[in-house]
Amino acid sequence: MIQVPSTLNVADNTGVKKLKCIKVLGGSRRRYATLGDVIICSVTDIIPTCSIEKGKVVKAVIVRVKKEVRRPDGSYIRFDENAAVIVDDKKEPRGKRIFGPVARELRDRGFMKIVSLAPEVI
């Protein structure tokens, strides 16, 4: 459950380390975002060689959340951190590598490129 002031780690190699959620896409009154949702974020922390400047507004897809998510078979999944992958307007990842596991829900949402780059799909 990601809402407007939430901070997220970045799970790709774009050079951005932390993001801050500034908008949840998908409706004018939508409050929370979960696995596979696209959000608008502000870049809050970067590494020195990053091509994206601090303060830049980017779109990101949520790949890991701390809050447990119920699956259709009745099982639950949760992670140790909130993490996202920066994407462009075509919903393709801007980085060339994905770090850490990603949820299987991304495949259902149509983010096949992120799923194929990830080292593990849970």
UniProtKB/Swiss-Prot annotation:
- Natural source organism: Brachyspira hyodysenteriae (strain ATCC 49526 / WA1)
Taxonomically, which superkingdom? Bacteria
Q: What protein is this chain from?
A: Large ribosomal subunit protein uL14
Tell me, what does this protein do in biology?
A: Binds to 23S rRNA. Forms part of two intersubunit bridges in the 70S ribosome.
Residue ranges that the Swiss-Prot or TrEMBL entry lists as coiled coil: none
| GO molecular function terms listed in the Swiss-Prot or TrEMBL record | large ribosomal subunit rRNA binding; structural constituent of ribosome
What GO cellular component entries does it have?
Answer: cytosolic large ribosomal subunit
Glycoprotein as a keyword of this entry, yes or no, is no
Q: Which InterPro entries match?
A: Ribosomal_uL14, Ribosomal_uL14_bac-type, Ribosomal_uL14_CS, Ribosomal_uL14_sf
Give the protein family. Belongs to the universal ribosomal protein uL14 family.
Q: Please list the GO biological process terms of this entry.
A: translation
Keyword Nucleotide-binding, does the record have it?
no
Listed under subunit, the entry gives: Part of the 50S ribosomal subunit. Forms a cluster with proteins L3 and L19. In the 70S ribosome, L14 and L19 interact and together make contacts with the 16S rRNA in bridges B5 and B8.
Q: Which NCBIfam families match?
A: rplN_bact
